[in-house]
């Protein structure tokens, strides 16, 4: 790593990230780009995270990072105050006082090529990738769009694929669950990093064998399967987006002579999981 005089400024790193993930590619409701930080401040170390939360902020401070690159926006919804006694206000004040800049790439990174779903597909060894939902205005064959469709290294049953996905993604309390016939053969798989039930119709139209995403809900899943859609796999939101951190970190290292770290902190909010077992003998009654 070079000295401070030769280090890039925040504006340089932001400009590079904006070229890779243009802000114009973000959804209209999204909030991406530089959230806070002095554009002229030197960047010697970057921490890549899925969520900018108090725990990852403390990681950044302990690592002496100058910039946090986050996937999820800190200020996605309007706030009326960033006073230090509010949740987001505390984060903002902590970062500003510590001279740590914050940059977010969200839906613009989702549709990029390579982007969030490419990283997820890479974890599973998918080949012959193509977008699940091509981006509006993307040139034919460009590869930009939401989600990816690819071929698994070998045909697996849905049950086998569920275990395979769980073994390839970062471990979380939520794990991986599947919907459909466990013996159904799967070779062509669609994936989408993050919440993906909005694209259930696209997965069905694409004719894939199964679709992996996060945050699937009861009624959309039930109706999708009843309508003859592909099998489904549901993983933790954080776990499906965490692979992208490795990709963006490697790219940043290639662009600048700086240290780039990846947070391994699981920011999935779920901390417990128990599988209900029917007809347990001798179940102990819990007194109120």
Role assignments for model-derived ranges:
Residues 1-288:
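Hydrophobic structural segments
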